Amino acid sequence: MIERIADRKFDLVSPYQPAGDQPQAIAKLTKGFEEGKKEQILLGATGTGKTFTMSNIIANLNKPTLILSHNKTLAGQLYGEFKEFFPHNAVEYFVSYYDYYQPEAYVPSTDTYIEKDSAINDEIDKLRHSATSALLERNDVIVVASVSSIFGLGDPHEYKNHVLSLRTGMTIDRNTLLRQLVDIQFDRNDIDFQRGRFRVRGDVVEIFPASRDDHAIRVEFFGDEIDRITEVDALTGEVIGTRDHVAIFPATHFMTSDEQMQRAIKSIAAELEAQLKVLRSENKLLEAQRLEQRTNYDIEMMREMGFTSGIENYSRHMDGRKPGEPPYTLLDFFPKDFNIMVDESHVTMPQIRGMYNGDRARKQMLVNYGFRLPSALDNRPLKINEFEQHVHRILYVSATPGPYELDRVPKDDIAEQIIRPTGLLDPKIEVRPVMGQIDDLVGEINKRVDAHERVFITTLTKKMAEDLTDYLKDMGIKVRYLHSDIKTLERTQIIRDLRLGKFDVLIGINLLREGIDVPEVSLIAILDADKEGFLRAERSLIQTIGRASRNEHGKVIMYADKVTDSMKAAIDETQRRRTIQEKFNEEHHITPKTIIKPIRAAISSYEQSDDDKAEAKKTFAEVDYEDMSKADKKELVANLRSQMQAAAKKLDFEQAASLRDTILELQADMS
C-alpha cells in the first residue's frame, strides 16, 4: 500500500503575465469555485489565451485536474501546452491506446459476425500507466484526456492494493519478489528487456515499470534482505541514482486476485445457465448453442490461463458489480475533490452524452443473437448522469457554449474572455446577395491574391465544393478543395501548401471550423449562409468566423438573400466582441498584428535517417500509391509506423495521430 503525497503545489512557469480579459476571468472563476460553485463557464473567443487562463485557475485552486478534450489531436496540443506551463508538476496524457480498433459486432441482415481486432500503441499505453500511477502517488497532477476517460478501466482499489512497495533494508526473499511481480502481470524475460518485464541475474532483479520507457529499477539482495535500490538507464545500465523506496505499480490496470477470479467464474456460469433457459424458452436454439459453446470456452481459458480474449465483457463479474452499476473509470482514480475542465465543451459534452447509447446498441445485438451474455452490456462507458456524480468542480471552456452547459450554469457564473493579448479584432462581417455571388467572390479573391493573403470558402455539399473548384481553376485562380474524401495525411499537406502559397483559395464544408489555424487567411466566404441547419447554425457560424480572427485584415462575407436568426445572432455576437476589443485597443494604444506562426515540415513517405535528412525526398501527398507494388506498399506502411512511434515518443501527438489515420487508410486499401 502506498500513501499519496498531498502537500505539493502547482508551479506555473510562464514569461507572460495575464493580460487583456485574462485577469478578470481568472479572478472571477477562482473566486466562484472557492465559494463553492460547482459549475462555471469560460466563454473565450478564438485566440484569447484560454489555456493560459485555465492554467492560472489550476494553480490557484491547487487540486488534481482532469482536462477533457473531444479528440486525440487537440488533447495532444493541450498536453504540450500544459507541460510547458507546469514543468515541475505531473502533467499526464490519457487517451485510447488503440492505433486501430474494430469492435466486436454482428449484422443480422447479412448474418455477419465481425470479430474484435485491434493494435495497441505501446507509447500511449505507457502514458496511461504514468497517469494512473501519478494520481495515486501525488496531488499535483493534471491529466489531459479524451472521452476514453469515461470507459471501463479496472478497480482502482485493487490496482492500489497490488502496488509493490520496496525499501532498502526490507526483509523479503528474492523468489517471493519474483512471484509478486508475476502476480501483478509482469513478465520475466532475461533477454528482451521492455516495459512491464523483469530480469534476474543472481541476487540482482531489474524491473522495467509499465509507466517508463527509459529507466528501470535495480534491486540488489544480500540474503533475504534488500541491500540497495538504484534507478538505471534501461539501455546502457548506467546508474542514474539510488532510491530508499520505490513503488512498483501493476503492469495492467485490470487487476484480479485468484479469489476474485474463482468468484467471477462461478457467477459467469450461473448467468450462462439462466440465459440459456431464456433463449431455449424463446426457441432460439442456435443462439443458445452458440452462447454455451463460446462462454464455456472462455471459462476454461480463465481457469487455465487466468485470461481470455474479450475478458472485458465479463468485467461486471470480475469487479463484483451489480447489474446496471457503472464501471470503474479514470475518474475513480482521482480524489473526490478534483477539478474537471472541458475544452471545446460544445463538442465534448454531446460526445460524452452520446457514448453510452452507441455502445449499447452494438452490444445489444451481440446479446440478442447469443454471442455474449447480458452482463457484457455493463462493460460500457458512463452515462451522463453517472459522469455528473463524479463532478465536484467543473469548468466548461468554449467560444460557443452548448445548450447543455448554458442550461446548467447561471449567467452570473459565465466569465467572458474577449480581449486578445495580441490586440487582434474579430473580423468585419458583410452580407451580400446571392445573385452574382461568384463574380463578386472572384473579385474579392483577386484582391487577397495581390496582397499575398489566403481565402477560405465554405459550401454546403462536397459536389458544390468540387464544382466551384473547377470553375475557379478555369478563371485562373489557384484553388483546392478539402472534404472528408481527402485522405488524412493529404489534408495536412493541403493546409501546409495553402500556408506556403502554392495555392491561394481553399474550399471546404465543415472542416474549416475547429482545429484549422491558418493566420494567412484574411477572407472567409460563406456561401448559402441563409440555409438554416447544422452547418449554418449560430455556433457553426461563430466557429467559422473565428478562423479569420488571426489576421489583422480579417473579413467574412456571407452570401444570402435574407438574414436568418442564426446569421443575426452570429453577426451581433461578433460585432459586440469587436466593439469591446476596439475600445480596449484604443485605451491601451495597441495596434493589432497578424499572428506569426511557423510552418511545420511535411510528413514524409519514409523514415529519415540522420544521413539523409538534408536530401530532398517526396512527401506523402506526392507518392502515387495506386501504382506501387504490394511489397512497396508494405514498406511504406512500415516507414509511416516508425515515424508515428517516433512522433509519439517526442510527445508530438498531432503528428502521430495524422500518421496513424493514414496507416489505417493505406491498410484498408491493401486489404
Swiss-Prot record:
GO cellular-component term (any): cytoplasm
Ranges where the Helicase ATP-binding domain occurs: 31-189
Domain UVR: 634-669
Keyword DNA repair in record: yes
One Gene Ontology biological process: nucleotide-excision repair
Binding annotation for ATP: 44-51
Subcellular location: Cytoplasm
Keyword DNA damage appears in the UniProt entry: yes
Function text: The UvrABC repair system catalyzes the recognition and processing of DNA lesions. A damage recognition complex composed of 2 UvrA and 2 UvrB subunits scans DNA for abnormalities. Upon binding of the UvrA(2)B(2) complex to a putative damaged site, the DNA wraps around one UvrB monomer. DNA wrap is dependent on ATP binding by UvrB and probably causes local melting of the DNA helix, facilitating insertion of UvrB beta-hairpin between the DNA strands. Then UvrB probes one DNA strand for the presence of a lesion.
Official protein name in the record: UvrABC system protein B
Native source species: Lacticaseibacillus paracasei (strain ATCC 334 / BCRC 17002 / CCUG 31169 / CIP 107868 / KCTC 3260 / NRRL B-441)
